[in-house]
A protein has these predicted regions:
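Short coil/turn segments
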Residues: 24-30, 131
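Flexible, solvent-exposed loop/hinge segments that line or gate ligand/substrate-binding clefts
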Residues: 41-43, 51-154
Length: 188
């Protein structure tokens, strides 16, 4: 499927203008600049409308469209609540960008086994005050070993998106995760 084919673009059109509608990044986000560059360099503006509204609100519309049997196109990342709602490999797949700032990578739940993601891959790592870590070497050792699966982080993000975002609720999420993964947690 080529989004530059107007017949395919219409499948993702929600406002009737014949262009695909794609939830992009909120104005001011770093990813907005990369998406804008992709649109400019690839001439995508003729075929796709980037929706730059509030990301959560725009994604709520995408999810509703998907649940109503419509085709959807959106920018996302992991971990993120969106992939906790629209499951990668079941509901949606990663699609390839024509180029990327980084090398081609193996990506599960994609249109093919190795592809250009269009964006550099980010790592999630803990950060802490240097003086605190010097005073607490066991904490530093713990943080170096700790690793939570992206799917679990996305699931927790989904809970927050559904309203469970108070400090008390987030602490409960952490306690539940630790209890369900006690052996792994203890190994850290």
């Amino acid at each position: 499927m080529c989004i530059r084919d107007r017949n395919h673009a219409k499948e993702f059109d929600s406002n009737g203008d014949g262009k695909a509608d794609m939830v992009a990044c909120h104005p001011g986000w770093g990813c907005e600049k990369i998406i804008s560059r992709h649109f400019e360099e690839l001439g995508l503006g003729e075929f796709i409308n980037p929706i730059k509204a509030d990301y959560s609100a725009a994604m709520a519309d995408i999810i509703s469209r998907y649940k109503n049997g419509k085709s959807v196109l959106f920018y996302t990342w992991t971990p993120n609540w969106t992939v906790g709602t629209l499951k990668l490999g079941e509901d949606v797949v990663w699609i390839e960008a024509p180029f990327s700032e980084t090398k081609v990578v193996s990506v599960p739940n994609a249109t093919k086994s190795k592809l250009n993601m269009g964006f550099g891959v980010n790592d999630i790592r803990p950060a802490a005050n240097v003086d605190f870590l010097k005073a607490n070497p066991k904490v530093e050792k713990f943080l170096k070993k700790a690793s939570i699966p992206l799917a679990d982080i996305a699931a927790q993000n989904l809970k927050m998106n559904k309203g469970e975002k108070s400090e008390k609720a987030i602490k409960k999420h952490a306690e539940e995760w630790i209890k369900a993964n006690q052996k792994t947690f203890n190994s850290w």
